[in-house]
């Protein structure tokens, strides 16, 4: 190799790195990567060869991960996130509407000129004008859209992996799709988010906290409806057997179709309308969309099977006999419902009260993707608020009724309108939000998400349409956060009515009810089945107990039916819990009517349930806090708020001078006593490089021990991660300052007003 070439190599490497960085970066002008689809480069076919299938998403081997470092040899197709943000903001949409009309008008003109075979010069002039109008629209979008939505996802994922926030589980064995391990930073971040969640909800609302079993017997989930209804629609490649979740497949195909060069405005509008309403379509309607647009396998171009239902629960066997079937819980809520009676007793029979639970749940996703967004094992933080079904007021609603939320109602979704900012008090008064308790939790959810660092302009509450409502809900709002993947459902807030407690009462015969005292005693008629135990035992032997238990569970309507049948043909057919039927006559049972005076009334409580997906919240927060230094795109960091930052403070001796060690050790001990997580970085690297390393793991503050620290009075510098500014603080004061900053009792702006800004050391040794 020549000397000239050897000298040129460093410059070539730098140039190559710069080009790769530029390619990987995504800005509004280059269309932000809301969804990333990978496709191998295709070669131009020979004239005799059949045309290739449209570009599709190739199958990724299970051994690969989705991290940015694996993407260097793939062609990345980018889709803009601007549209999704703008659609949620009516003020921005109003400003852009005239520009959109001008672009659409010019686009139609270009199509007409081409269709009529107009002179080439006329077409070129029209195209030039179209480009100018599109540029004007894009510039306006860029000016109006927050920078938080625009970022380099591949660069962020590289940083997350390199600093081990989280990584794919069992990576050395090839990894498992949809499963992730949290490293030291990810684990600390998750713990801090959950600690703040407990403070905001469990502590503030004086909730009862439980920790229930993950293994759930089948009868529990049969009663709740999960065995029958907890399924997604799936289609298969008829040749390879590859499985695809149907709604995701349709969305991907229609997005691609609407962005094709020959897509008409009518087709684009049709595709957008279907995508918006996709979650509300049933099996037959989704199959119709599949057939209408002739959607094929995205991996092979092969035909797909008819949609089939796939239950998302992980089945297992409890015990060695294999006779007890169970599931890994799909949600934590059922453990709370089956313990309702004990919890009500613990609360001295009083309503309302709320129960909190944090734990892992499991769903056997058909096609897990998008990192922490869609996984098979995930942490949930759920609340079950039990209240009187006819009195769903909340005592603290007055504290939050003026809170403004961005609400995307079901009506606005159906009419193609944007979300709107509404005071939660007005939303409840107008019945847009069903009741005060639901509205209270929605406002508290917003306060919590903003406190951990979610950007307010990227948060909205979307109401479920009636045909997409969960089987247990009578009203439901999802807190959705805008990320590079689009709007992601992170918190569900549902009014589950009395469904769950009613189902478990019917299945077990255990009355999961509450009581309330009546204003005045009242006389009521009572009907009950009176079994002739002697006759039952003689006739049915060992089955007599099952029959007696089944009779005790009959409702008032069923008792009336028993009486009618006994009066008719003298027989009543009873089905017991084991599925067997028994004919009972007047000699074995009778119906007794009586009256009694009651002072209390029984009722099945309603439940309002906020359910937090911690992994999704974490990922959204990491995106919103990811930044690169101005003028140095290689220096990336996370602006996580001190409240949730994994490590609150770093201690950085200026050099490895042994005189610094006593001060470093003293600071470390003081921070530990103050219960502040911290990291000592006394490595030999330059102080600037060490600052950059601590910024990468989101440490908000750094204490530097320098030569001025050795002088009386002993002082240190305190550095802020976001601004990189430093102040000079007394050695004995600095831990208290960091404590106040980390618990949000003070701000960095207040600290800079109280202490002098640090410019340079006075002493050098």
Curated annotation (Swiss-Prot):
The protein's name in its UniProt record: Glycine--tRNA ligase
Similarity section: Belongs to the class-II aminoacyl-tRNA synthetase family.
Domain WHEP-TRS positions: 95-151
Pfam families, per the entry: HGTP_anticodon, tRNA-synt_2b, WHEP-TRS
SUPFAM superfamilies in alphabetical order: Class II aaRS ABD-related, Class II aaRS and biotin synthetases, S15/NS1 RNA-binding domain
Binding site residues for glycine: 331, 382, 609-611
Enzymatic reactions: 2 ATP + H(+) = P(1),P(4)-bis(5'-adenosyl) tetraphosphate + diphosphate; tRNA(Gly) + glycine + ATP = glycyl-tRNA(Gly) + AMP + diphosphate
Gene from which the chain derives: GlyRS
Job description of the protein: Catalyzes the ATP-dependent ligation of glycine to the 3'-end of its cognate tRNA, via the formation of an aminoacyl-adenylate intermediate (Gly-AMP). Also produces diadenosine tetraphosphate (Ap4A), a universal pleiotropic signaling molecule needed for cell regulation pathways, by direct condensation of 2 ATPs. Thereby, may play a special role in Ap4A homeostasis. Required for terminal arborization of both dendrites and axons during development.
GO cellular component: axon; cytoplasm; mitochondrion
Superkingdom, natural source: Eukaryota
Composition bias type Pro residues, residue spans: 47-58
Annotated GO biological process: dendrite morphogenesis; glycyl-tRNA aminoacylation; larval lymph gland hemopoiesis; mitochondrial glycyl-tRNA aminoacylation
Origin species: Drosophila melanogaster
Keywords assigned: Aminoacyl-tRNA synthetase, ATP-binding, Cell projection, Cytoplasm, Ligase, Mitochondrion, Nucleotide-binding, Protein biosynthesis, Transferase, Transit peptide
Subunit (UniProt): Homodimer.
EC nos: 6.1.1.14, 2.7.7.-
Molecular function GO labels: ATP binding; glycine-tRNA ligase activity; transferase activity
Residues noted as binding ATP in the record, renumbered to the chain: 363-365, 374-375, 489-490, 616
Disordered, as annotated region: 41-73
Transit peptide per record: 1-87
